[in-house]
């Protein structure tokens, strides 16, 4: 990328965005070329990343470059311009399907070892872990997030409002979340006084020390956490909520993020499935274990694997699963016509998309009969789920939002350098034995943070870099100055991590000229209430949030304001000086692909690409 010829790198990804790219990218090049702008493509699809990871298994002419690693390198250069389209954050079933498809095309990549038995299997699984989940975003997002609805898009939504379901004060829809034993209640935080190198280790009750992560390099001023979720508390919570939904006659739905949180949330998802179907699973445990059934991958894993059984045995298992529903609540459906439930696959119901859709529909989801119904929305982790309950309370009191008059809620998100939980995948572990989980300084042996944990608990260590926090505060002030909008930092005083963040935000705001700006810091629930009260008055409010709330709110408000999150302008000013421009905040729209196959019609809206291209050319 020389100064003589500006270059835009346009990513090739997956599903609907990739199909749209075949039509749109040639047009971009046709207009860019006479202007002296070079437009290069870079394939970071799931398939390309699998092939790059296992190039040693391929013939010479089948090998592809590691484009993701190269893009990661380019984010550190000051003149980089990347247009990034949505890509699949592959769940295990999606990853396994991609592997099978590649093998059928003649690529000798290894099978995905769901249950590794040998060291070789474990090594292969570790390599596939680099491709699964949100493997792309932590590499490319070397800056914080600026997401907003462009004025023209907002005005169009006001003049041509999308459909919105009616809210009733009698709605029984509510969020169910853990009151103890989750990450929120099991969190400790520390602001580092100096640069350190630490390890994560488990001291078992039997006296053995297991090093789970031998080395994590940390800088002065970085914030680290030790947080865990109790398996016992989680399963107890599920049983209580399933029983409550059955007794009260309300539909049951589970909302997690098993794609992005690729280590922790498939486990959280799987425990719910196992508790729900515990009678059938207990009866057939031996054969299900022999088949290697893993419902962390959804009920689809069970149905696929029992296909290998004799017909009568298979039918008995299916009948026993169906019999469970006689004393369990109705399940929310992903596809009522095809009988696909909330438990089919962990990637089917993703909290940041499913909760806004439910709220837009008047607090309802679809049941088995194809009708919309009130639901118990189970969000196990309470850290962020309370904001949804606050919005539900607001809607029950004030009614549905009006797209023709409501204000807008842009977001400035703390995202750079794999901030917070979204960067913790390589530091997240399912505890193998009861013991004490410690974060230890490698040089001094000092235990920085410690937790008592039990077998099956999920323990993780998020890291938030001081430089990323400074840049986030700067971006929030800049957006306040440019837009004239009020900014609210959503930071709880009761959560240890956010208490540390509040201190830094207050300190770093002093580095900027904030005269004439309205900048506030509020706990999450207060911030939601304050923002909603302004929204219904047509007032605009920038939400400055951490990484998970960035993800949640940049779906929640656009879906209510615009009908979709795909029409957002999503800019990532890279900390090295370049820019990454994400095309909206939506996903890769697999249903669009299904419709294309069935009807030969692609309904993908490329407005996000146009917006990103415009910002990139500027």
Which sequence ranges carry the predicted segments?
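Extended, well-ordered protein cores
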Residues: 2-270, 278-504, 508-618
């Amino acid at each position: 990328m020389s100064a003589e010829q500006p270059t835009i790198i346009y990513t090739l990804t997956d599903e609907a965005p990739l199909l749209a790219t075949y039509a749109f990218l040639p047009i971009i090049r046709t207009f860019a070329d006479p202007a002296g702008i070079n437009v290069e493509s870079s394939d970071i699809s799931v398939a390309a990343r699998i092939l790059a990871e296992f190039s040693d298994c391929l013939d010479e002419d089948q090998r592809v470059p590691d484009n993701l690693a190269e893009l990661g390198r380019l984010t550190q250069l000051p003149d980089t311009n990347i247009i990034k389209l949505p890509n699949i954050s592959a769940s295990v079933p999606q990853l396994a399907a991609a592997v099978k498809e590649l093998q059928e095309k003649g690529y000798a990549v290894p099978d995905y070892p769901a249950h590794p038995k040998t060291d070789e299997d474990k090594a292969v699984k570790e390599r596939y872990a680099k491709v699964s989940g949100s493997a792309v975003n932590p590499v490319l997002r070397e800056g914080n997030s600026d997401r907003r609805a462009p004025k023209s898009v907002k005005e169009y939504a006001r003049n041509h409002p999308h459909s919105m379901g009616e809210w009733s004060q009698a709605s029984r829809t509510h969020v169910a979340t853990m009151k103890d034993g989750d990450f929120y209640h099991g969190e400790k935080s520390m602001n580092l006084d100096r640069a350190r190198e630490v390890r994560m280790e488990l001291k078992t009750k039997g006296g053995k020390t297991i090093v789970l992560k031998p080395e994590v390099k940390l800088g002065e001023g970085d914030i680290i956490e030790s947080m865990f979720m109790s398996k016992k508390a989680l399963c107890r919570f599920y049983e209580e909520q399933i029983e409550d939904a059955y007794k009260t006659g309300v539909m049951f739905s589970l909302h997690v993020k098993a794609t992005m949180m690729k280590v922790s949330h498939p486990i959280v998802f799987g425990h719910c499935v196992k508790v729900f179907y515990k009678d059938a699973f207990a009866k057939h445990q031996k054969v299900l274990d022999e088949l290697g059934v893993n419902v962390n991958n959804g009920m689809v894993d069970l149905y696929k694997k029992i296909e290998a059984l004799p017909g009568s045995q298979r039918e008995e298992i299916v009948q026993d699963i169906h019999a469970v529903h006689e004393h369990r609540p109705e399940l929310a459906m992903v596809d009522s016509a095809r009988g696909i439930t909330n438990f089919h696959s962990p990637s089917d119901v993703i909290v940041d998309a499913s909760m806004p859709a439910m709220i837009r529909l008047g607090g309802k989801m679809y049941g088995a009969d194809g009708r919309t119904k009130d639901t118990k929305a189970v969000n196990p982790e309470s850290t962020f789920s309370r904001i949804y309950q606050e919005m539900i309370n607001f809607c029950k009191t004030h009614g549905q939002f009006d797209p023709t008059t409501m204000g807008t809620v842009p977001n400035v998100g703390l995202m750079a350098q794999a901030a917070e939980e979204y960067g913790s995948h390589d530091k997240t572990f399912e505890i193998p034995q009861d013991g004490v989980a410690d974060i230890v300084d490698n040089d001094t042996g000092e235990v920085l943070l410690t937790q008592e944990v039990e077998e099956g608990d999920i323990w993780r260590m998020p890291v938030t870099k001081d430089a990323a926090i400074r840049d986030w505060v700067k971006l929030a002030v800049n957006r306040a100055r440019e837009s004239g909008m009020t900014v609210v930092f959503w930071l709880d005083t009761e959560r240890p991590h956010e208490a540390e963040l509040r201190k830094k935000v207050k300190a770093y705001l002093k580095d900027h000229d904030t005269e004439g700006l309205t900048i506030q810091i509020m706990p999450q629930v207060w911030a939601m209430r304050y923002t909603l009260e302004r929204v219904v008055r047509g007032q605009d409010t920038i939400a400055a949030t951490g990484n998970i709330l960035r993800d949640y709110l940049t779906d929640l408000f656009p879906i209510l304001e615009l009908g979709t999150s795909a029409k957002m302008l999503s800019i990532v000013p890279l900390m090295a000086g370049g820019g990454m421009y994400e095309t909206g905040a939506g996903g890769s729209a697999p249903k669009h692909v299904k419709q294309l196959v069935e009807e030969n019609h692609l309904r993908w809206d490329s407005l996000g690409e146009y917006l990103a291209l415009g910002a990139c050319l500027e």
